[in-house]
């Protein structure tokens, strides 16, 4: 298994598919990286030389924010919104949907399991 950005990449998959196992790299960035390094689309990770793996690793380190750094930045952005006290920050703090979804009947994923209310029967 090749190790790129602290993640073990599966060896039997195509390179652009295997790169998507790294947090922060999706289909678009994976294609960009593969074309920038100059690797054919149908090559598999186990067919790559150590030099090509090193080129991929350097391209990712130079141009993309992935794994821990990306997670840290996202959590810092959410924390900043919460510290500002803006509407989006309040919604994050209260564990409610942030982007305007309805909460009267839905949003169970964000709010958690339904809490029973004493004396409330139909």
From Swiss-Prot:
Leader sequence segment: none
Record-level GO BP terms: translation
Gene3D superfamilies the record matches: 1.10.8.50, 30s ribosomal protein s13, domain 2
Keywords in alphabetical order: Ribonucleoprotein, Ribosomal protein, RNA-binding, rRNA-binding, tRNA-binding
UniProt-annotated stretches for the region Disordered: 97-122
Entry-linked SUPFAM superfamilies: S13-like H2TH domain
Quaternary organization: Part of the 30S ribosomal subunit. Forms a loose heterodimer with protein S19. Forms two bridges to the 50S subunit in the 70S ribosome.
HAMAP family: Ribosomal_uS13
The protein, known as: Small ribosomal subunit protein uS13
Organism, scientific name: Brucella canis (strain ATCC 23365 / NCTC 10854 / RM-666)
């Amino acid at each position: 298994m090749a190790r790129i950005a602290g993640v073990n990449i599966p060896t039997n998959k195509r390179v652009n598919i295997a790169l998507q196992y790294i947090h922060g790299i999706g289909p678009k960035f994976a294609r960009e990286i593969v074309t920038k390094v100059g690797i054919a689309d149908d090559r598999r990770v186990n067919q790559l030389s150590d030099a090509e793996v090193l080129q991929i690793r350097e391209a990712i380190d130079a141009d993309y924010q992935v794994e821990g750094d990306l997670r840290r930045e996202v959590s810092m952005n959410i924390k900043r919104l919460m510290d500002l006290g803006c509407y989006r920050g309040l919604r994050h703090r209260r564990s409610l949907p942030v982007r305007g979804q309805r909460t009267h009947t839905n949003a169970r994923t964000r709010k958690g399991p339904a809490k029973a209310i004493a004396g409330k029967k139909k």
